[in-house]
């Protein structure tokens, strides 16, 4: 086997771009319908009242209101509390 790989060959180039995951709107923040609340892989946060879940597990607001984080049956959930 060759101990040198040859012209125009490299052993580098394997660093991928960041996925920009995480919480995008924090507790108490006012949001409008359609705003992204959490970008995630898997369901680290589950959708609660007024929150929908996309095909890539992104959580988004279904209605306008304030973001509320909490737990339900041991799971972290995100709710939207309508502003009265």
From Swiss-Prot:
A single Pfam family it belongs to is: Ribosomal_L27
Q: Where is this region: Disordered?
A: 1-22
Q: Which domain of life is it from?
A: Bacteria
Keywords for this protein? Ribonucleoprotein, Ribosomal protein
Give an example GO cellular component term for this record. Answer: cytosolic large ribosomal subunit
What GO biological process terms does the UniProt entry carry, in alphabetical order?
translation
The record, for InterPro entries, names: Ribosomal_bL27 (IPR001684), Ribosomal_bL27_CS (IPR018261)
A GO MF annotation of the entry reads: structural constituent of ribosome
Task: Point to the regions of Polar residues compositional bias.
Answer: 7-19
Q: Which HAMAP family match?
A: Ribosomal_bL27 (MF_00539)
Q: Which PANTHER family match?
A: LARGE RIBOSOMAL SUBUNIT PROTEIN BL27M (PTHR15893:SF0), RIBOSOMAL PROTEIN L27 (PTHR15893)
Query: What family classification does the UniProt entry report for this protein?
Result: Belongs to the bacterial ribosomal protein bL27 family.
What's the protein name?
Large ribosomal subunit protein bL27
- The species this protein belongs to is Streptomyces coelicolor (strain ATCC BAA-471 / A3(2) / M145)
Per the record, the gene is rpmA
């Amino acid at each position: 086997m060759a101990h040198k790989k040859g012209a125009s060959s490299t052993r580098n180039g394997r660093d991928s771009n960041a996925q920009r995951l995480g919480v995008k709107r924090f507790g108490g923040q006012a949001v409008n319908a359609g705003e992204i609340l959490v970008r995630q892989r898997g369901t680290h946060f589950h959708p609660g009242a007024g929150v929908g879940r996309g095909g890539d597990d992104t959580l988004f607001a279904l209605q306008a209101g304030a973001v509320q984080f909490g737990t339900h049956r041991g799971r972290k959930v995100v709710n939207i509390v309508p502003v009265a």
